[in-house]
Amino acid sequence: EPVAQGRPRFSNHGGFVKAYDPAKSRNGKQHVRYAAKHAMEGETPLLGPLHLKAEFGIMMPKSQARKRTPRTREYRVKKPDLDNLLKLVKDGCGGVVYLDDNTVVMITARKIQCAQDEAPFTRVSFEEIEPLSDASS
């Protein structure tokens, strides 16, 4: 199940305020990092300008499941926000797929609600793209 980056939490220990990730976000980042390390298997991190392509399949709420006419895929216009899903993926891939998230210069993403018989998923790919030419249009 895709996980969105949660708001930071704060705690006070001995007069010092400490910010930390919620457990769900922390575990989601670890899962993304593990999958990224497995996919990269000894490859060096990408350096140039990158195009991030992502697709998130969110599970259908149980209240919408139908027995006679199963529901098909559709765009998900409810929570979680697409930008928060992307933040978690970018944070999890940092240092593994690329060294600096500033190298991601283009993003193509969509968030859908899975069909009734489909498992939730996250698909991510990174592609190095050509730098813009110096010629002005």
Pin down the residues of each PLM region:
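Acidic, proline/glycine-enriched N-terminal capping motif
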Residues: E1-S137
